Amino acid sequence: MDDTLATDVAPTALPPAPGADRYRSLDFADTAATLPAGQSYDLLAAPESAMRWLAAHDLTTPDVQLYEVCAQRMRTLRAHIRTLFAARVDTTAPPQESLHAVNEALTAVPTAPLLAWDGARGLRRIQAHPTDQAVNHALATLAADAADLLTGPDADILAACGSAPCDRFLLRTHGRRHWCSTRCGDRARAARAYARRSGASD
């Protein structure tokens, strides 16, 4: 299951969707999308761009090198998270495959600092994630974040952008908000105005 798109071109003048600052999994889900103008982008299309996204979200350090297999695992988890988000928005039962994938990521590594004993410093918390497990740790963190969103109070305001063909997700931080950006909102309003004018002239 993979929603990889053909390009890693970043969207221009398109801010993060509402709620992306509170849930990294929401921003993660929106790393691949189709914009209102029909342009597609995928910020995880290549290992280099996937690494930049992880580093920008404090999910790894810049010295970690990503390979295509790691980027593919990120894209696969993203596809499953998007499927779970869509099921929540549509109030349908989520596929067991996607639940299993998120649960597998959740339990792959501990996401919290572990308690360890150091003879010189005593008890302390440590992140027991060697470099080769950096992606496992990032995916576990994103899976936990998605689970928190889907089971918490904000699940009720999770929505899909209402300006087709844009398929980004957002939190409806305002009751009547149905778009992921001003750009999408303006386009939807313009389309409605055009439809009204066309109907009046028939």
Please identify what each model-predicted range represents.
Residues 1-160, 168-169, 201-202:
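Short helix-coil boundary/hinge micro-motifs
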Residues 142, 186-189:
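Short, hydrophobic-biased amphipathic alpha-helical segments
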Residues 192-202:
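Contiguous alpha-helical segments
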